[in-house]
């Protein structure tokens, strides 16, 4: 009897959560509800003292639409119009309060925004300006309610279902994590949460490339809405004319925040959630990589800690906002652990023939994330193969490396071929470096500066950036000395399974 009660303690909540999940899925599958604002009923606002006024020697008139009742939720507002002045603005009112505004530009005929209504019923109206000299023609104003609330409910139910199932498995004894495993999991979760502290607010810290990546996310979303898949042209860029950014910058992983945008989540939340996912993946990947190589759980935690809390990682994530680069980092660990398995595993092991899969996934992730990282990883891989040439050119190992390279290229051919074709035939800045003086030699540093650790007198001058920030620094220099010492110390010993030799 007690066992039956113990089972029902988890079965009944799971059943309720499954029913709720099915309910939210049905609501999501229903067509989006659209609410049209009655433009024909627009009236001149005679009650306002400022309804008529002069601007540029022409009489301006403020018009108000009939209110439409909107239920609580997140909405996309779309305006189709024609106007001759870019200064025309549509104000969106919820009752007597202005909640949003849209600037109507003469260059476009469609504008859109998103807004949120928190009350159960919201009397929404719009006002706009027009004059006889440059009249504004509003074709239609449509509010489309998104499934944001339903998706939030579905995600919440799925999380509760996962927690309930996991608790049931632990309670039933089917999963018995040790204290060490529990502590490891808690430490990894703690690293992820702490590393994402800058995300826990209602603003976005705009780094160097934030606007560019936000435009990419919105570009994918709008491209999907226009019927493109995969999205080759971002419609929003260049005043609606679009731009083929995906030809030069892989965006496979940006479909995650773009789909979140389609679900009704805000751009800010989608962007932050994506960074959170990247940090979580990177921490877990680095942990398993170092643990696999060192066969030590503590070293795995140390490696993940040193990575996620490194100054460069924080600068890259929140200062430079190099989303492509930080996405690629998580896949670096897959490449390292994959090559480690290929070079250290017994070639006669039955599992050896499948060891190309993990590094192939790693190379694919880097290619789809960041081109510069791809070049660096390719050079590092070639150098590793040459340094370990005695192992590289053994038949089975060489075949595994060959399968890794060929599979990585084949899987990403849809991106690589257009990229190479565009680099060769398109007139872009990177291919005209001789004309614009952006050669590597003009922006590099002297060999001596690479090892500088002092701060030059020209602290505020341009050369300071090249001399200090691109120098290796004290930490790297000391680390290099340690590696050289260890290598010399153990050079005459059997170090087949010593991980530091591989890393060095």
What residues fall within each predicted segment?
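Glycan-recognition and processing domains
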Residues: 7-74, 85, 93, 98, ...
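Extended extracellular/luminal ectodomain segments enriched in beta-structured repeat modules
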Residues: 69-78, 121-123
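Noncatalytic modules at the cell exterior or secretory-pathway interfaces
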Residues: 117-131
């Amino acid at each position: 009897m007690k066992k039956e009660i113990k089972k029902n303690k988890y079965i009944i909540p799971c059943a309720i959560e499954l029913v709720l999940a099915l309910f939210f899925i049905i609501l999501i599958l229903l067509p989006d509800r659209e609410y049209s604002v009655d433009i024909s009923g627009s009236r001149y606002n005679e009650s306002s003292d400022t309804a008529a006024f002069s601007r540029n020697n022409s009489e301006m008139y403020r018009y108000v639409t009939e209110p439409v009742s909107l239920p609580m939720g997140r909405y996309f507002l779309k305006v189709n119009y024609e106007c001759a002045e870019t200064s025309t603005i549509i104000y969106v009112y919820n009752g007597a309060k202005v909640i949003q505004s849209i600037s109507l530009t003469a260059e476009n005929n469609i504008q859109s925004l998103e807004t949120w209504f928190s009350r159960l019923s919201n009397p929404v109206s719009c006002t706009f300006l027009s004059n006889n000299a440059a009249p504004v023609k509003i074709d239609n104003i449509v509010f489309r309610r998104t499934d944001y609330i339903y998706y939030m409910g579905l995600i919440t139910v799925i999380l509760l279902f996962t927690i309930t199932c996991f608790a049931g498995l632990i309670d039933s004894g089917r999963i018995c994590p040790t204290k060490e495993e529990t502590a490891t999991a808690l430490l990894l979760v703690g690293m992820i949460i702490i590393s994402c502290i800058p995300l826990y607010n209602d603003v976005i810290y705009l780094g160097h490339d934030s606007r560019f990546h936000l435009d990419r996310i919105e570009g994918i979303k709008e491209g999907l809405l226009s019927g493109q898949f995969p999205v080759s042209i971002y419609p929003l860029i260049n005043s609606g004319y679009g731009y083929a950014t995906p030809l030069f910058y892989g965006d496979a992983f940006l479909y995650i925040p773009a789909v979140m945008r389609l679900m009704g989540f805000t751009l800010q939340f989608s962007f932050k959630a994506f960074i959170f996912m990247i940090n979580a993946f990177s921490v877990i990947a680095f942990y398993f990589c170092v643990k696999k190589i060192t066969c030590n759980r503590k070293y795995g935690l140390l490696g993940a800690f040193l990575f996620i809390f490194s100054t460069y990682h924080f600068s890259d994530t929140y200062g430079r906002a190099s989303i492509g680069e930080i996405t690629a980092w998580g896949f670096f660990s897959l490449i390292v652990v994959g090559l480690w398995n290929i070079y250290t595993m017994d070639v006669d092991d039955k599992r050896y023939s499948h060891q190309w899969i993990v590094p192939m996934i790693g190379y694919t992730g880097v290619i789809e994330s960041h081109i510069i990282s791809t070049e660096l990883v390719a050079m590092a891989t070639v150098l590793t193969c040459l340094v370990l040439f005695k192992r590289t050119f053994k038949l089975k190992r060489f075949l595994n490396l060959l399968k890794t390279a060929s599979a990585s290229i084949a899987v990403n051919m849809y991106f690589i071929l257009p990229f190479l074709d565009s680099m060769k035939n398109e007139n872009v800045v990177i291919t005209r470096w001789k004309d614009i003086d952006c050669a590597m030699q003009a922006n590099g540093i002297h060999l001596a500066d690479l090892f500088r650790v002092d701060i030059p007198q020209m602290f505020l001058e341009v050369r300071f950036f090249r001399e200090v920030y691109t120098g290796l620094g004290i930490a790297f220099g000391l680390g290099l000395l340690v590696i050289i010492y260890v290598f010399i110390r153990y050079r005459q010993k059997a170090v087949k399974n010593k991980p530091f030799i591989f890393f060095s």
